[in-house]
Structures are given as structure tokens and as C-alpha cells.
Amino acid sequence: MPSAIPMLYLPDTMSAWPWQRAINPYFNEVKAASNSWFKSFRAFSPASQKAFDKCDFCLLAALAYPRARKEHLRTGCDLMNLFFVIDEYTDVEDANVCRDMVDIVIDALRRPHDPRPEGEVVLGEIARQFWARAIETASPTSQRRFLETFIAYLESVVLQAADRDCDAEHTVQTYLAQRRDNIGSYPSYAVLELALDIPDDVFYHPAMNELSLYATEMLIIDNDLVSYNREQASGDTNNILFVIMRQFNCSLDHAMAWAAAYHSQLEARFMDAFKRMPSWGLEIDSQVEEYCQGIANWPRGNDCWSFESGRYFGDKGREVQKTRCVPLLPKKERDTSLRQQDVVITSL
């Protein structure tokens, strides 16, 4: 009699979150334009491009920015695609190669109207075109904050590669600290303010900082819960569940429960900070409200995308969203050389 397949239970961390699913009405139109633009770079092999299509990163943008103007949704879609290609190119490289790639992207963002040199990795041209289009409709304050946060994200990519190189082990505290920049939430929040002009003294108020921090850590937990199955099968331990199990010497079930409980604490802290937001006058308050509502929607949009796209569960996402159960994948030896062949790093 065959043994039963082990099942993984995913806690429903978003069951009490008051912000409900919404999607941008320009989704299909903007997705077609953004994906056509991205595919024109031929950044992936056919196999890797097929995986990209299943992920449907434009769906993530449409769920994360349901009230964005058409041109700002385009920026969001392009940004999600840019995140993906940077992740795919750097995830198989050591810290030195990642450093070179990151420097190219930073230079392209700082000089969006200058042509990129021939023979350069295609990341530079993708980033240059993305930013040249984005700044046409972005407020000056949002441009500055996007660059600050996106460069911090890029630097974290190099740090993550260095961690891989030396098989670094983290505590929950140090893991969350390095993932806050690496998950890409802060530049994603900058898209929320493309049409806004929030002064620095308001934007960096402690209550505002708390909102973005708590939402970011919610995103980290939710992403790690849904990606754990695939990562445990491939031997990738850069996941908060592995960190919890190692630090507290506990089972996977206990790690899941710990992560879900911490997620609930973050939700409560977020709501408290939301209620403590001061007033700066009608004009500023309306912009702050729009921005904060956008941050609050991000965890909901990300959660919906995790099950509606094929990123984590293929065509079983809706079923998993209902049952919260997924068969535990068998472990296999991690072979990064195969992934390198799939990525096929492209130059201009």
C-alpha cells in the first residue's frame, strides 16, 4: 500500500486583513504593452521565458496598484518585470559578478538618456528604458525616493550573494533586517506616490515609517510561506521558516505557527500606527491618506497574486487558496548550472 503524500498546510495570514481584493481596470491593456516591451530584450531562453509568463508579474502590479493611472500602472508593471530579471540574473552568480551587474543598473538609472555601451549585460538597457519612461510622469519627490530605495534594494542583492557564497546563517532578527531591502517593497511603495508630492518631514514621520516597515515584514512572511515548498525541494534555505526551525530547534509546523503569530502582531502594529497618523492639513492629509491606503493594500494584492498567478502553485493556486493544503515536494539536488543555462545572460 503506497504511503500517504506529506501535506504542507499554509496558514491563512490575511483572513482578518480589512483591505479587500481590487484590480486596476487598465490591467489587460497595460500588461500587453509592458510584456511586449520586456520580451523585446530577449533576456531569457524560451524555457525561462515560459516560466516568466506563468508568473504574470503585471497581475501583481494591477492588484498592488488598483487605483493607479494608466501611465503609473505601466511603471508598476515594468518595475515588477525589472525585479524579476534582476533576480534571475543575479541569483546564480557570486557576489563579485552581482556587484558588476548592480553597478551597471545603478549607472543606467542615473543616466537614463545616455545610450548603454555595446556588449554590456542587458540589465542596463532594461533599467535605462524603464526609468526614462517612468520619469516622464513621476513627481520629483517620488523620483528621488524611488532611486534611494531601489539602489538600497540593488545593494541588498549583492549582500545576499555574499551570504550565499559563505553559506551565512541568520537569526530571525538579522534575516528580517536583510530581507527588508531585498524584497523590493520600498521602491514598490514609491510607485504609490508617482502622482503625489509629500514633503520629507511628513514622509519620514515615525508613524509613516512604521506603516512601511510592518507591511514589508508581512510581505516577507507571506512570500516565504508560499515559496517554502519549492525552496525546501531545491535546497534553498533563504526562507524565514528555515531560520525559525534552526534558531528555535522546532518542527516545520511550529515554525509555520510562529510565523503566522508574528504576522498577526505585525497586523496589529500596522493598525495602531495607521490610527496614530497625525494631521498636516487638508491638502497634505489627502495625499498621506492615498499613500497609506496604497501601502495597506500591498499585502492583500501580493497574497491574491500568489494564488492567482502560476508563480508558486502552477494551475492549482485557486484550489490551494481554498484548502490551504499543498503536497510537499520531494527534495532534489540543487543544480544551479541548469538554471544558468535557462537564464542565458544576454548582452547588448
Swiss-Prot record:
Catalytic activity, EC: 4.2.3.135
Protein residues bound to Mg(2+) 3: N223, S227, E231
The reaction(s) this protein catalyses: (2E,6E)-farnesyl diphosphate = Delta(6)-protoilludene + diphosphate
Cofactor: Mg(2+)
Paired cysteines (S-S): none
One MF term in the entry's GO annotations: metal ion binding
Binding annotation for (2E,6E)-farnesyl diphosphate: R311, Y312
One record GO biological process: isoprenoid biosynthetic process
InterPro entries, per database record: Isoprenoid_synthase_dom_sf, Terpene_cyclase-like_2
Top-level taxon of the source organism: Eukaryota
Site (Plays a critical role in the stabilization of intermediate cation): F84
Keywords, comma-separated and alphabetical: Lyase, Magnesium, Metal-binding
Binding site for Mg(2+) 2: D87
Binding site for Mg(2+) 1: D87
Motif (DDXXD motif): 87-91
Top enzyme category: lyase
Annotated function: Terpene cyclase that catalyzes the cyclization of farnesyl diphosphate (FPP) to delta(6)-protoilludene.
Record remark: domains: The conserved DDXXD and NSE/DTE motifs are important for the catalytic activity, presumably through binding to Mg(2+).
Protein name: Delta(6)-protoilludene synthase 18
Organism field: Postia placenta (strain ATCC 44394 / Madison 698-R) (Brown rot fungus)
Lineage: Eukaryota, Fungi, Dikarya, Basidiomycota, Agaricomycotina
